[in-house]
UniProtKB/Swiss-Prot annotation:
It is a single-pass membrane protein. InterPro entries: PSII_PsbJ (IPR002682), PSII_PsbJ_sf (IPR037267). Keywords: Chloroplast, Membrane, Photosynthesis, Photosystem II, Plastid, Reaction center, Thylakoid, Transmembrane, Transmembrane helix. PSII is composed of 1 copy each of membrane proteins PsbA, PsbB, PsbC, PsbD, PsbE, PsbF, PsbH, PsbI, PsbJ, PsbK, PsbL, PsbM, PsbT, PsbX, PsbY, PsbZ, Psb30/Ycf12, at least 3 peripheral proteins of the oxygen-evolving complex and a large number of cofactors. It forms dimeric complexes. Detected in both etioplasts and green leaves; PSII is only assembled in green leaves. The gene is psbJ. It comes from Hordeum vulgare. This is Photosystem II reaction center protein J. Signal peptide: none annotated. SUPFAM superfamilies: Photosystem II reaction center protein J, PsbJ. The keyword Iron does not apply. GO terms for biological process: photosynthesis. Pfam families: PsbJ.
Length: 40
């Protein structure tokens, strides 16, 4: 696990990819809760 030279750390990928995913999921659930997500 220590051989990460020349490669992007997995936690960094998870963080960068996780933030927009959480945002999209939050917007989707908020939209569906507000009655706007049914159009999706």
């Amino acid at each position: 696990m220590a051989d990460t030279t020349g490669r992007i750390p997995l936690w960094l990928i998870g963080t960068v990819a996780g933030i927009p995913v959480i945002g999209l999921v939050g917007v989707f659930f908020y939209g569906s809760y507000s009655g706007l997500g049914s159009s999706l």
